[in-house]
């Protein structure tokens, strides 16, 4: 092995297998690009992103860790979200939750 070398297994890697997911349409009403990281609580993203916010409480993007999705001004796209795992307690971000999630599934 060479220092810094990656040895990557061939084929597809499944992420979040068996976890609850949902899709939503998101539109950037702002005048600047907005980037959302893989583990950001989607409910608390930039207010310039317009979507059914209440339906996304407790969810994050269903993308590989360390990656992000970029929304250009005026861009509309569908994203897939995955339910946050673990104790489902959210702290930080924009401070909209700050504790236990009260998720209304259905």
Curated annotation (Swiss-Prot):
One record GO biological process: urea catabolic process
Subcellular location: Cytoplasm
One family name in Pfam for this protein: Urease_beta
Catalytic activity: urea + 2 H2O + H(+) = hydrogencarbonate + 2 NH4(+)
Major localisation: cytoplasm
Enzyme class: hydrolase
The keyword Hydrolase is assigned to this record: yes
EC assignment: 3.5.1.5
Gene Ontology cellular component list: urease complex
Biological pathway: Nitrogen metabolism; urea degradation; CO(2) and NH(3) from urea (urease route): step 1/1
Record keywords: Cytoplasm, Hydrolase
UniProt-listed InterPro entries: Urease_beta-like (IPR002019), Urease_betasu_sf (IPR036461), Urease_subunit (IPR050069)
GO MF: urease activity
Assembly and binders: Heterotrimer of UreA (gamma), UreB (beta) and UreC (alpha) subunits. Three heterotrimers associate to form the active enzyme.
Annotated HAMAP family: Urease_beta
Family designation: Belongs to the urease beta subunit family.
Record's protein name: Urease subunit beta
UniProt source species: Enterobacter sp. (strain 638)
């Amino acid at each position: 092995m060479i220092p810094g070398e990656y040895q990557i297994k061939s084929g597809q890697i499944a992420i979040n297998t068996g976890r609850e997911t949902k899709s939503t349409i998101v539109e950037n009403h702002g005048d600047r690009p907005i980037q959302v990281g893989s583990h950001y609580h989607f409910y608390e993203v930039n207010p310039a992103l317009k979507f059914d916010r209440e339906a996304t409480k407790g969810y994050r993007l269903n993308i590989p860790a360390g990656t992000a999705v970029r929304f250009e001004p005026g861009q509309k796209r569908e994203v897939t979200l995955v339910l946050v795992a673990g104790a489902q307690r959210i702290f930080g971000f924009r401070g909209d939750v700050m504790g236990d999630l009260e998720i209304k599934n259905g």
